[in-house]
């Protein structure tokens, strides 16, 4: 019998290692941990809930604790009636209820949503300032148990700020703007979906990281959300979220009184408009009595706003704030207001100055329930930006920071980029307002300027993909956002390690590997995309995904690099530039005003310098570009090798899904590297001192091969092709063949093929060496859940690579690729590369 039990234990452990998982449970897997009979006997065996009403967060806490103990420890927690002496039990209650029923207890002062957790072996007490806080405490304790942490603890914790929201940019048709994880879980075909199971699971995940509200629809809002049938649907969403303490809010279209209400104006001072919005708000609160509030994007990127009627932004915001006040609702008003038709020939023009110019003079004119939602940088979620100076210019107005979990400019979940180290460059930044410590994190909490409201918002954009965001590793960013919103001084790496244990288990090699990959990922992505503060050199006019540095300039969007043959960068100084540095407090402005004191990683944000300018590192700007792009691509290839070392330590489904993305990222990093380096080499004529840029001895350009049914094609932008040229089939319904005789010495090689995977077709390619087929593949990224914004062109978005490893070749063998066109995709090819195994070209 003892032998059988041991066998069953070993079998259970093995099954827990290899059982397929799809990511739907996120970090709430409640995976089994080793805990023998003696271990389990030292833990609670009962759960006691005080004042648990149906659907309340405290009832949810009890349900989660039971499910967690059963899954993690195979222990069946039984419910026990409340008693003050709760030995061998987990007691969950609000602090006030506990004090009314039992003796007073020495617990530090708690803020709303805070909790006290005391764990003494088989007796655990979780006391929340409110029911939501009690639920947070239950999740905290379960996270300890799930990480096999059974230590004795007694501590109180309260949130950094009262507002800890997430934003979804979901559209009424079910699409998601800047969403890369599938369709909306909230909307479809103009109405609210029937199935609330994914909504409930999302709320569960959010509650476990202490997020207290979600704005369910796009800031580019559709007024039809305010139709009665959709208000009723919002009520169902709120009902699904309420047991987890998650409130819902909605984004509003400023012109709704005219577009939906039949009025001939949406002037925020018009009595009819004011009455219309009050009536809408009253109606919404009948369906959602605990609605968190509204989010408004106005006078920005074509969205209507108060400026149409020559009204101020504060007058526009206060219209909604006053309608919400009887219900305790909050109005989040985005500071993302700027002119998208700037004149680049004006040396003083600067989009980065817009937020301060629009909002500073309105400080103190907003209602007390208005919170200005400020992006972390002054442009738009770039790979690196300086801290928005608006945080230092609103003394008498509530503020919140806006982050983006959805990787709009940062690889769209197809590239691994762990974001907290980026976020912390802003959160930990000291703005030195009035020469006093002024960390951004202390400004948004309200502490610095004695504000009672403020906090956090993050654009998340989960979808129907079972991984939520499209990528298993991208979920670390959502988890970390919640952790930082509660406690912004937590270390990025510690958060990551906790997430990894909860998501992938206790294996030290797994934890160390994922931690190393993730902590390296943001610097690597910055290296192969945009350096020295120049911003992410992506296509800002199209997908925001692949490389296209020319799109930054010669348009009115204001994300300019001002790059030319001789020099690069925006002069934002007071002395000779746009004056942007003057928007910062004196101590910070002084640092950025001087080229000598500006850190290298922001030098091109603040200064216009020659390409030959030497950085503090001693390297010229152009050589830094070349070096960084090669280093970044090298690091991306390293991620694949690191991940492959985890084979067998992670379940097959998640291992393979993540491996395919990392392989794709490695190939796309080469596309990025070459595009940026070639673009600026072509612009400057300054060679790479290491001789790498434009020199690829391992490559065979497709246009140099013998072509039958293929023709050459000039790619635009030129840098999106290795030699500015690709090949495509002569028509979209034909087959093309490209052949060449291999000149490389006989041996074993990795063969990479760079091609273009266009939206709207699934071409088929077959690669042969000699008389043997090496491999076949389809151009099916749009059907293979990759999820990034697709392209219908041969460009840096559609460019990708497939690699076949360990192929034996003989000098003189014929290498042949047959491409079969499909749809709009003409089986396009860029080049073939023969590499000694392990070499990055």
UniProtKB/Swiss-Prot annotation:
Enzyme Commission (EC) number: 3.2.1.139
One GO term (biological process): xylan catabolic process
Record's keyword annotation contains Calcium: no
Top-level taxon of origin: Eukaryota
Cellular component terms per the entry's GO annotation: extracellular region
Induction details: Expressed in the presence of D-xylose and L-arabinose and at very low level in the presence of D-glucuronic acid. Expression is under the control of the xylanolytic transcriptional activator xlnR and the carbon catabolite repressor creA.
Glycosylation site positions: 51, 76, 85, 149, 222, 279, 310, 343, 450, 465, 527, 576, 682, 723, 732
Catalytic activity: an alpha-D-glucuronoside + H2O = D-glucuronate + an alcohol
Protein localization: Secreted
Class of the enzyme per the UniProt entry, highest EC level: hydrolase
GO molecular function: alpha-glucuronidase activity
PANTHER family per UniProt: ALPHA-GLUCURONIDASE A
Role of this protein: Alpha-glucuronidase involved in the hydrolysis of xylan, a major structural heterogeneous polysaccharide found in plant biomass representing the second most abundant polysaccharide in the biosphere, after cellulose. Releases 4-O-methylglucuronic acid from xylan.
Protein name as it appears in the record: Probable alpha-glucuronidase A
